Amino acid sequence: MPADPGPEVGSGWPGLLMSCLKGPHVILKMEAMKIVHPEKFPELPAATPCFPPAPRPTPTLAPKRAWPSDTEIIVNQACGGDMPTLEGASHTPPLPRRPRKGSSELGFPRVAPVDEVIVNQYVIRPGPTASAPSSSGPVIAGEPLECPTCGHTYNVTQRRPRVLSCLHSVCEQCLQILYESCPKYKFISCPTCHRETVLFTDYGLAALAVNTSILSRLPPEALTAPSGGQWGGESEGSCYQTFRQYCGAACTCHVRNPLSACSIM
């Protein structure tokens, strides 16, 4: 009995595999390359670039001037090499340094002497006879000893002279009336030059300094407290008594030395 030949060649997966093995062989050619490092052959010359780099131009530096002169030139201040000299040129020495200013010239506040009175950034210096008042003898010309508004002589109690911003003095009684006549604006017009003094603080008339130069020239009777009431018993010619005569529009006090023009109102 003949043997079973088995499954037919070419049928199924085994046949397909066998048919692939029996096909023509494909040979792929590959070239092998060997990389050799140049460190192993130091005798070989280094490869030169095809195009050498173009040389760069060196910039020329302008010489520095040591001082304002066209003949003296310093090429390099950091190196101590030879300096170019110009024949026939005069050497101009550098300008001397200015001395430093002292503390008084730099605007530092100075210490004011004891006999000076500073009023609203002004300085009042006493006269030559301020330290020794004389009871007898002529009075040296200066600011008058009478108030320019009421005409009464200053004293050390109710009629002390107060200095305004214009450096004119007015007695305290007249200043109080001028101050109360315009409570809204708080500035006083000088009866002498008609300039205005603004009181920026709430101290009122106490913000105005007392003119000690006038007090030092007062007679002895003005240095004592007067007898009478608050205003010294002066019933006539007093600015306090003529308070009702102040006109609201012109602000004029009709006394011995009235104000011709006042810009308070």
From Swiss-Prot:
One of its GO terms (molecular function) is zinc ion binding. SUPFAM superfamilies: RING/U-box. CDD domains: RING-HC_RNF208. A zinc finger (RING-type) spans 147-194. GO terms for cellular component: cytosol; nucleoplasm. Residues 83-106 are annotated as: Disordered. Disulfide bonds: none annotated. Keywords: Metal-binding, Phosphoprotein, Zinc, Zinc-finger. The modification Phosphoserine is found at residue 103. One of its GO terms (biological process) is protein autoubiquitination. This is RING finger protein 208. It comes from Mus musculus (Mouse).
